[in-house]
Regions:
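Periplasmic c-type cytochrome electron-transfer domains
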Residues: 21-358
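Sec-dependent bacterial lipoprotein signal peptides
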Residues: 1-18
Length: 358
């Protein structure tokens, strides 16, 4: 082969290699996250997912890590999971949570499961989305007490998180926006819908006579002649919460210590109103009420059976103040038996929701 031909072939080979590098080597990997397939039990309705934060495998797993990540706190000792523990349905078994500075809050931690269906978050409803809710604890002086700027700096120099955020959100710089988006994605997967009640409702198991009696009491009003627990107005199935706000007669006007919803609306009509908590997994979420005043379900039932305290904002549904629900000892035991059917063991022990660092 002549020198000229060899030179031409050599040049063509160089051009070919360069073209391959242009198309295959220099082009960055295409952002292609894996859609997360959300499994919702048939007893629960469909879930609305924000268009700007779709669920992905990468985002959910990152959110799980961040939920358990103590780097999000000022001294590196607390995470979201410190006050939202899986064994107690992602709430705190203590009456009040204690922040990194040793300061206690004044409200009991709410559960973090099935919260994707709730239009507002916190006892006073001050957050309108899971993303908005997740912004607060990190900077709260009685909670994790850090700054988002400091958290971002820690995550950006971390050995793993920059790559994980790149895969989840296609970002080169980590900031609070994508941290809370990831946490919110994980929290949307915290779905509890496989309790004994769910299985009974689907026709898979049978209730005992006592549980059926409790279910009946749960769903009827007290009359002048018969007992009724009257729970269903605020705690109706399938969520066992109405997601709204009520003053359930815990205190009279002179003893209100927490203004509740009033802090958000500044309406006198909303004083001492708090968000209705779900009764799902209620057996393991003690203590109860916004201030954790009741240590047991028995105490909660006694409060309602007593009838509660009157006040200027007490809910009209608390219509038996003074004479209560007329529940007999047997009725109370039946109601408690039903409430225990709302416990979802599969959810409470699901390894997909556990600490990934253990």
């Amino acid at each position: 082969m002549g020198i000229a031909k060899r030179a031409i072939l050599f040049l063509l080979a160089i051009v070919f290699v360069q073209s391959c590098c242009i198309t295959d080597c220099d082009e960055p990997d295409e952002y292609d996250p894996t859609p997360y397939v959300l499994e919702i039990p048939s007893t629960l309705p469909p879930m609305d997912i924000p268009a700007d934060n779709p669920l992905t495998e990468e985002g959910v797993e990152l959110g799980r890590m961040l939920f358990y990540e103590p780097l999000l706190s000022g001294d590196g000792t607390q995470s979201c999971s410190s006050c939202h523990q899986q064994a107690t349905a992602f709430t705190d078994p203590s009456r009040f949570s204690t922040g990194i500075d040793g300061i206690q809050g004044d409200r009991n931690s709410m559960v973090a499961f099935n919260s994707a269906w709730s239009p507002t978050l916190f006892w006073d409803g001050r957050a309108g989305s899971l993303e908005e809710q997740a912004l607060e604890p990190v900077v709260g002086p009685i909670e994790m007490h850090d700054t988002w700027l400091n958290v971002a700096e820690k995550l950006n120099v971390h050995s793993e998180y920059p790559e994980l955020f790149k895969k989840a959100f296609d970002v080169d710089e980590i900031d609070s926006t994508h941290v809370v988006k990831a946490i919110a994605q994980f929290e949307r997967t915290l779905i509890s819908g496989n309790s004994k009640w769910d299985k009974w409702f689907r026709g898979e198991v049978m209730f005992t006579e006592q549980e059926l009696r409790g279910w009946d009491l749960f769903n009827v009003d007290r009359t002048d002649f018969s007992a009724g627990a009257d729970c269903f107005h605020c705690h109706g199935a399938p969520h066992f919460t109405d997601f709204t706000f009520h003053n359930n007669g815990l205190d009279g006007d002179e003893t209100f210590s927490d203004p509740g919803l009033y802090e958000v609306t500044e309406s006198d009509l909303d004083r001492a109103k708090f968000k209705t908590p779900t009764l799902r997994n209620v057996e393991v979420t003690a203590p109860y009420m916004h201030d954790g005043r009741f240590a047991s379900l028995e105490e909660v039932v006694e409060h309602y059976n007593f009838g509660g305290h009157t006040s200027s904002t007490v809910d009209p549904l608390m219509k038996n103040i003074g004479d209560g629900l007329l529940l007999s000892p047997e009725d109370k035991q039946a109601l408690l038996a039903f409430l225990r059917t709302l416990k979802d063991e599969e959810f409470l022990n699901n390894p997909q929701f556990s600490n990934p660092f253990e």
